[in-house]
């Protein structure tokens, strides 16, 4: 495993399957979780200030500006398929371990992922 891969730090939303959290920790990633009920603005600010990739099932975060959140991974893999989620997440990590993900939105699907830029502040 490359050291650059471990440079990614994650902030997991309360709606993310615990098996993904355990997987990331088992790979020695820096993973932070948030208290249940934390406000979206607080989550975005924590992601930005700590340069953490925010992982969520919530589509609301896909419209946040790159000035207000560091990076968003929007999970589109069904929550009742945690094994598929881990396989998809692992493939995505292998393809992004050397990339600067600041200001990006990653849409993670069961068989693929898409990377695009988050919108800029209007």
Segments (PLM) and residue ranges:
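Ser/Thr/Gly-rich flexible loops in soluble cytosolic domains mediating phosphotransfer, phosphorylation
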Residues: 73-111
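Ligand-binding "clamshell"
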Residues: 66-74
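Acidic, metal-binding active-site segment of PIN/NYN-like and related structure-specific nucleases
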Residues: 47-65
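N-terminal first-folded block
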Residues: 8-52
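Charged phosphate-binding loop/patch that engages nucleotide di/tri-phosphates or the phosphate backbone
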Residues: 1-2, 8, 96-122
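Short, charged, surface-exposed secondary-structure boundary motifs
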Residues: 40-45, 67, 81-90
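Short, acidic/turn-prone active-site loops that include or flank metal/cofactor-
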Residues: 34-40, 60, 77-82
């Amino acid at each position: 495993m490359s050291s650059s891969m471990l440079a990614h730090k994650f902030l997991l939303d309360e709606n993310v399957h615990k098996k993904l959290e355990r997987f990331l920790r088992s790979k020695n990633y820096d993973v932070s979780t948030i208290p249940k009920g934390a406000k979206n603005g607080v989550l975005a600010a924590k992601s930005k200030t700590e340069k953490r990739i925010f992982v969520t099932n919530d589509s609301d975060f896909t419209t946040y500006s790159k000035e207000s959140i560091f990076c968003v991974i929007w999970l589109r893999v069904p929550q009742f398929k945690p094994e598929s989620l881990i396989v998809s997440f692992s493939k995505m990590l292998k393809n992004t371990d050397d990339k600067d993900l600041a200001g990006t939105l990653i849409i993670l699907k069961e068989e693929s992922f898409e990377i695009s830029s988050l919108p800029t502040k209007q």
